[in-house]
Amino acid sequence: NYGINNPFARILTWPAARTWAPWIAGDTIRFAPRNDGQAKYWTTSYPSVATLPMGALIKAVNALDHGLFLTPALFWYSDNDQVVQAEATDRIRRQWGADWGTVATRAYPDLQPGDDPAAHVVAGAIMSPGQTDMMVAGILGWLKEIE
């Protein structure tokens, strides 16, 4: 998550946002769960100010020199993500500190009906069950490649 896919996300890091942001966003952020698993295991209601640390973290991480990062990284995300900015993730991946395919590897999920319609949670039994086996195999294969 290197950029929130919402034009109002920038206010998360504005001065004194903890005081006035709830006036704009409301005190609580809520969403309707997509299925029983999400209703049971996910937080579907939380204080709007809980998003402020995420905004600060995104700002701080984007300010880093990612060219210095030599740790292998697998970026597995959808270009159609409606929650975060896929182009921001791609920008960071391209800046990562080694050649493409060795340290910063890109994987593309093949989302199908029944998977997350927001293309954000690209694996897992609750949101994208059709992707989980493929992602596990992809991660294990990637780990073998970088050994």
Per-range role (PLM):
Residues 1-57, 63:
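Alpha/beta-hydrolase-fold enzymes
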Residues 13-22, 96-99, 127-130:
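Short, surface-exposed linear patches
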